[in-house]
């Protein structure tokens, strides 16, 4: 059984730059303790005869075929641009050469 202390939660929250109240730290300590207990249960399973896999279920390529289609009209798109030049979006310079 794993006990996560409120202090551990506060330390991890501090490292992650998260603010947690005393009440939240206490609640999270209990929740994280339960999660770790479940993971420890999984560690007791015998997986010697389980074939390694990257997915829990069989996955086939479900992506659509890459087919070129007509895009948006350039003038229609650029009419909403704050600035354009030579048929392209013009953006402020952020780096000098």
UniProtKB/Swiss-Prot annotation:
Source domain of life: Bacteria
Keywords per UniProt: ATP-binding, Ligase, Nucleotide-binding, Protein biosynthesis
One record GO biological process: glutaminyl-tRNAGln biosynthesis via transamidation
EC number: 6.3.5.-
Enzyme class, broadest EC rank: ligase
Family, similarity comment: Belongs to the GatC family.
Role this protein plays: Allows the formation of correctly charged Asn-tRNA(Asn) or Gln-tRNA(Gln) through the transamidation of misacylated Asp-tRNA(Asn) or Glu-tRNA(Gln) in organisms which lack either or both of asparaginyl-tRNA or glutaminyl-tRNA synthetases. The reaction takes place in the presence of glutamine and ATP through an activated phospho-Asp-tRNA(Asn) or phospho-Glu-tRNA(Gln).
Protein name as annotated: Aspartyl/glutamyl-tRNA(Asn/Gln) amidotransferase subunit C
Species whose genome carries this gene: Listeria welshimeri serovar 6b (strain ATCC 35897 / DSM 20650 / CCUG 15529 / CIP 8149 / NCTC 11857 / SLCC 5334 / V8)
Lineage, opening ranks: Bacteria, Bacillati, Bacillota, Bacilli, Bacillales
């Amino acid at each position: 059984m794993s006990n996560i202390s409120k202090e551990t939660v506060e330390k991890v929250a501090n490292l992650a730059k998260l603010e947690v109240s005393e009440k939240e730290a206490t609640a999270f300590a209990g929740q994280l303790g339960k999660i770790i207990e479940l993971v420890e249960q999984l560690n007791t399973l015998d997986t010697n005869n389980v074939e390694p896999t990257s997915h829990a279920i069989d996955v086939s390529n479900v992506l659509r075929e890459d087919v070129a289609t007509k895009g948006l009209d350039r003038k229609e798109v650029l009419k909403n641009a704050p600035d354009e030049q030579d048929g392209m979006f013009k953006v402020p310079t952020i780096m000098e050469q």
